[in-house]
Amino acid sequence: MSSYHAAYIDYELRVTESMTDTMGTDTEITLKPYQHFVASVFLGLDKMHSLLLFHDTGVGKTITTTFIIKQLKNIYTNWSILLLVKKHL
C-alpha cells in the first residue's frame, strides 16, 4: 500500500470515527470490528467512489453492505436504493 493510500485510509477513519457500529432493526445488530472498518473506509471516501468486497462465505459482506446503505440513506434522504441479494445466503 502506498503512503498516499495509507494516509487516505487514516483520513477516512477520522472522518467517520463517531459512526455507530450498531444497526437498529427488529433486533439490534452490531458489526464486528473488521466490518465496521470496511464501512468506515467506504463512507469516508470522497475521491475514490467504489469499493469491491470479496471474502469467504459467512464473514458478513451482505450485512456490511446493508449497514453502508443504511448510512448512505441517512445522508442522502432523497435517494432510492435497491439492494439485490441471492435468496439463499
Swiss-Prot record:
EC no. given is 3.6.1.15
Matches recorded under Gene3D superfamilies: P-loop containing nucleotide triphosphate hydrolases
Residues that coordinate or bind ATP: H55, D56, T57, G58, V59, G60, K61, T62
Indicate whether Oxidoreductase appears among the record's keywords. no
* Keyword annotations: ATP-binding, Hydrolase, Nucleotide-binding, Transcription
Enumerate the catalysed reactions. Answer: a ribonucleoside 5'-triphosphate + H2O = a ribonucleoside 5'-diphosphate + phosphate + H(+)
Catalytic class of the enzyme: hydrolase
List the SUPFAM superfamilies: P-loop containing nucleoside triphosphate hydrolases
Stretches assigned to the Helicase ATP-binding domain: 42-89
InterPro entries the UniProt entry points to: P-loop_NTPase, SNF2_N
Superkingdom classification of source = Viruses
Which molecular function terms from Gene Ontology are attached? ATP binding; ribonucleoside triphosphate phosphatase activity
Would the keyword Magnesium turn up in this protein's UniProt record? no
Q: What does this protein do?
A: Serves two roles in transcription; it acts in concert with viral termination factor/capping enzyme to catalyze release of UUUUUNU-containing nascent RNA from the elongation complex, and it acts by itself as a polymerase elongation factor to facilitate readthrough of intrinsic pause sites.
Q: Which family does it belong to?
A: Belongs to the helicase family. NPH I subfamily.
Kindly provide the name given to this protein in its UniProt entry.
Nucleoside triphosphatase I
